[in-house]
Regions:
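A short, N-terminal "cap"/entry segment at the start of jelly-roll beta-barrel domains
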Residues: 1-73, 176-194
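Conserved GNAT-family N-acetyltransferase fold
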Residues: 79, 99, 126
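Conserved short histidine dyad/triad with adjacent acidic residue
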Residues: 55-64, 77-92
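Conserved metal-binding segment of the jelly-roll/cupin
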Residues: 82-84, 120-141, 149-151
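Double-stranded beta-helix
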Residues: 2-12, 135-194
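A short beta-strand-loop-beta hairpin characteristic of the jelly-roll/cupin
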Residues: 86-89, 93-122, 132
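A generic fold-level signal
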Residues: 69-73, 93, 141
Length: 194
């Protein structure tokens, strides 16, 4: 087995500088009101790296680099949330999601209705198995950042679904038209809990 020698120019293509990143735009799904998107997502999400995929997804489209393909594919991003904020409960069915707390404190909630939780402090890490309904929420008193790592087969990165009651929450808070726009835009509701 031999080593690989790469020069500084090639190594620079493998560096992502935070100061050069812009947050990934909030998903725009057929004129879904921005407050619905805010309910479903972190305040800001910075995509550092995503796998090269045949079907371009929002993960790859806005990533600073494509890579991490040493076997299973990997996506690396940072979710930034103000106190009390985080995405809606959801499940990844074919990919594994891991969280590393960078700043503030984050509750990792899981279970069919998010009935279980634990708190990550800075430098704490958790790995959530596929199929588990989960979310994260900043429970600190200041804006926080969470490193989010998703790993799986490159064509399985659009595997997110939301429990049916999240659809009910959207309908109650934002109306049936908002939910219709979410589902027609590709969001899946009605996860099966076994």
């Amino acid at each position: 087995m031999s080593t690989v020698d790469i020069g500084p120019d090639e190594m620079q293509t493998r560096v992502v500088r935070f100061r050069e990143l812009s947050p990934r735009p909030k998903p725009s799904v057929d004129d879904v009101p921005p407050e619905v998107t805010d309910f479903m997502t972190a305040d800001r999400n910075y995509s550092y790296m995503a796998p090269a995929m045949e079907k371009i997804s929002v993960i790859q489209k806005f990533a600073a680099m494509t890579g991490g393909d040493a076997g299973d594919a990997i996506s690396v991003s940072v979710a930034v949330c103000s106190p009390g904020r985080g995405p809606a409960l959801h499940a990844h069915f074919n990919t594994v999601e891991a969280f590393f707390c960078l700043s503030s404190r984050f509750a990792i909630e899981w279970g069919p209705t998010g009935e279980h939780s634990l708190v990550l402090e800075p430098w704490d890490f958790i790995h959530v198995p596929k199929g588990v309904v989960r979310t994260f929420r900043n429970v600190g008193t200041e804006e926080g950042a969470l490193l989010v790592i998703i790993q799986g087969n490159r064509d399985d990165f659009d595997d997110v679904a939301y429990p049916e009651y999240v659809a009910q929450q959207i309908t109650e808070r934002f109306g049936e038209e908002a939910l219709r726009k979410m589902t027609s835009g590709g969001r899946t509701f009605g996860t099966v809990i076994s």
